[in-house]
Every structure is written in structure tokens, then in C-alpha cells.
Amino acid sequence: MWFKNLQLYRLPTPWNIDLAKFDEQLSRGPFVKCPSNQPMSRGWVSPRRDGALVYSLGQQWMIALSVEQRLLPSSVVNEEVKERAELMEAQQGYAPGRKQLKELRERVTEELMPRAFTRRRTTYVWLDPKNGWFCVDAGSPAKAEEVIEHLRHCLDDFPLTMLHTQVSPQAAMADWLAGGDAPAGFTIDRDCELKAAGEEKAAVRYVRHPLGDEISGEIKAHLASGKMPTKLALTWDDRISFVLGEKMEIKRLAFLDLLKEEAEKSAEHADEQFDADFALMTGELSRFLPQLVEALGGEVVEAK
């Protein structure tokens, strides 16, 4: 259950909603299996599979959104439509028009949908109501938006905003690379991507390559030519490694093995392990995120 990605958002501090009310409002949109005639279904599931839609430990919460989709390849639909269109042409003496083809495609899709396989995925979210963190374990903003959209559908009020810092991640990464050093508490690792802003989007990638003195001049030359960093691998406090993206996304989030071993030692059963993992993960992230924001010049607080 250790998160591997973070899409970062902010809630008011504190967010004044109690656990019982939050759980009650989530129950407006529980997950149900995808009906045979529908392409998709989504809803809340128990993160711990104990029936509760909100898992709570201390003042930290976790929720989970499941999405089930029916897999109906367009190539299968197209082939069936083509065969039926040819049969229609033979029967009526002329090729079906645009309207007929549209209706035919809709009918074929409706007929084939119940026979399509389904695929299910679950996205987890960590909420810290006291400190205003809303973090989605998703590799793309689109998957985070699925969660946010369903929350807006269920909650009476959901005052979520993007996280904005005084210095953009891209500008900060460029500054760190140009200076050859990361801010206090962080170290630069061995992965980096720089891209040009022009139409060709020329890119340079360093993968598992030390970014120290040996190539710092090379990187500075790329920066001077107009390329800007879009990804940079970093480690915080020798405890968390991650890749920071230009749009504030965090990927390849990895916690020091020692932390996981510590959680394993403190748990004897699966439930205890879940609690220990969540407590350690949220404890580390609660320290890490404010320091990352500080490294980016501090948070831009919107005027109320």
C-alpha cells in the first residue's frame, strides 16, 4: 500500500469536515460492478477491504476509487459494422449513408458490450484534513481528476485547489542543476530530462548517470541553449527517493527499505501491517512535503 506516485492538491487548513460526515457522503457513490450494457462503472471501495469507505488512523485518512471498464476494441466493432454494411448494401442496392452507419455502429456496440471483458483498477488517496493535504497515488493528472470528479459528485462541499509554489518546479530544477547542488535536505540523483521549448521539442535524457562534475558543464550548456528540465531524480533526507516533474507531479516515489523493515517488525498480522505501513508512510510524507514546498520558495496562498 506504499504510494508510488503523488498528484498534489490542497485543502483548507484545517478542512472542517468530520470523519462520520465524510464517510456518509461518500456512501452516495459506492462502487458497483459494471452493468452489461455500460462501458464503465466507478465508485468508492473500502481501502482496507473491511467495509468502511474511509480508512482512518490518527488524523490521517485514506479512500479508494475503483473503476471498471469493458474492453471492446474498436477494431472488433469496425469489422462487425463493415460486414453488416456490406449485407445492407446487397439487400437495399446501395451503400448505407452516414446516418445509417452511425445507427449501425451504435447497435453493434450495444450488442457486443455485454460480451466484452472487464478490467478493474483502484486509485488510492491520502487525506490530511488538519494540514490540508490531498494526495492521489496516480501517475497522471487524468487519473487524479477521476477521483476529484467523483468526490465533487458525492460531497456537499469540496474546496480543493492546486498546489502552487513561489518558484515553479521547472525553474527550481534549472537553478539546482546550474548550481550543481540541491537545496538543504535534498540530493540530486542520477536521472534527468531536459527539453527545448521549440516545435521540435528536442530532448536530452540522463538515465542512471551521475550528474556531478563530469557532466555538469554539459548540462549547463543545455540550459544555456534554452533547454529546461522536465524531470529530475532526487532523494530527501536519505529516506525518500522520487522524480520531480515540471508540473509538480511526483513519480517513482520510493521509501527507504529500512522504513519498510521497521513497519514489518512492528506488525504481526495483516491488519497490523496495514496500520504500520500507513502510519510510517504518512508520517514521512508529512515531513517531506513541507520541506519540498520550502525548497520551491514556499507556498503561494490564495487570498480569501
UniProtKB/Swiss-Prot annotation:
The keyword Cell wall biogenesis/degradation does not apply. One of its GO terms (cellular component) is bacterial nucleoid. One of its GO terms (molecular function) is double-stranded DNA binding. It comes from the Bacteria. It is found in: Cytoplasm, Nucleoid. It holds the Pfam family RdgC. Keywords: Cytoplasm, DNA recombination. GO terms for biological process: DNA recombination; regulation of DNA recombination. The keyword Cytoplasm applies. HAMAP family: RdgC. May be involved in recombination. Belongs to the RdgC family. This is Recombination-associated protein RdgC. It comes from Dechloromonas aromatica (strain RCB).
